[in-house]
Curated annotation (Swiss-Prot):
This is Large ribosomal subunit protein bL32. Disulfide bonds: none annotated. GO terms for molecular function: structural constituent of ribosome. Residues 1-22 are annotated as: Disordered. One of its GO terms (biological process) is translation. Transmembrane segments: none annotated. Signal peptide: none annotated.
Length: 57
């Protein structure tokens, strides 16, 4: 495991961590019951099987 040679300041640590950004999931169109919904790709199978409500309610 990599170990730093010296202590990193709090401001450097926080500025390094702030570079990470969350990304919006890519949405895919799925037709369920005659209605088309846009859901994340990882939930397509669950929506088709009826395990997840595509309306999100």
């Amino acid at each position: 495991m990599a170990v730093p040679k010296r202590r990193m300041s709090r401001s450097n640590t926080r500025s390094r961590r702030s570079q990470w950004k969350a990304q919006a999931p890519d949405l895919v169109g799925v037709t369920v019951g005659g209605a088309t919904h846009r859901v994340p790709r990882r939930l397509v199978k669950a929506v088709k099987l009826g395990l997840v409500d595509p309306a999100g309610k």
